[in-house]
Amino acid sequence: MKPYPRSERVAARIQEILSDLIKKKVQDPRIELVTISSVRLTSDLRIAYVYFSVFGDEARVEEATQGLKSSHGFIKRHVASQLGLRYMPELKFIHDQSFDRGTHMDQLLKSVLKGDDSE
């Protein structure tokens, strides 16, 4: 028996393919700073939720989202050719806000520590 479900193995492979594709083959400048942080796949392998992060502000995130939407067909064809599944999962790109929340928490902790030092 495999150590983890097929959906997790396929999700890991999709993440690997997408990361490589964005780094090397997609020439859209709107998504050059996009990082694929994780992929979650439904148990029936029909929908892949692709979580991405972008270095920059909200305008940069919106640009990256539009870039991913406009490149969706190219990305899906490339992933399908590399994946070799009977059915290619539908890719749904979602901005991963965990990095933003982590940065915000870090700033809050630093401000609290600075406040303690001044007292």
From Swiss-Prot:
Main location per the UniProt record: cytoplasm
Domain of life: Bacteria
Residues spanning the membrane: none
Positions of disulphide bridges: none
Pfam families given in the database record: RBFA
Gene Ontology terms describing biological process: maturation of SSU-rRNA
Cited function: One of several proteins that assist in the late maturation steps of the functional core of the 30S ribosomal subunit. Associates with free 30S ribosomal subunits (but not with 30S subunits that are part of 70S ribosomes or polysomes). Required for efficient processing of 16S rRNA. May interact with the 5'-terminal helix region of 16S rRNA.
Subunit structure: Monomer. Binds 30S ribosomal subunits, but not 50S ribosomal subunits or 70S ribosomes.
Protein known as: Ribosome-binding factor A
Species assigned in the record: Desulforapulum autotrophicum (strain ATCC 43914 / DSM 3382 / VKM B-1955 / HRM2) (Desulfobacterium autotrophicum)
